[in-house]
């Protein structure tokens, strides 16, 4: 069975912009290293039904497989960089959403 892409959905509020900026500058290199692709972010998402997302930024990016996403997240250098995100944001969630397998 081929790998199925996964999507990372993140909701956070930036509380210390300088710390978050350090994280942001290093983030894209790690994302690329693991085959990840930045999809989008939105500081004002529109909720059509249900409770609105928590305050802050919604971010979506993609990995080619669950294993690639888990390897990215477990990378020791990435985790060291993530200390800047932790110091500079209030994280509501960081969630993996599985994509659909290819259709024949």
Name each region found by the language model:
Residues 86-104:
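C-terminal end-helix/capping segment
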Residues 1-74, 98-104:
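Short S/T/G/P-rich N-terminal loop/turn motif that feeds into the first structured element of a domain
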Residues 70, 77-88:
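C-terminal structural segments of small proteins and small subunits
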Residues 37, 81-82, 93-96:
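A short linear hydrophobic-aromatic micro-motif
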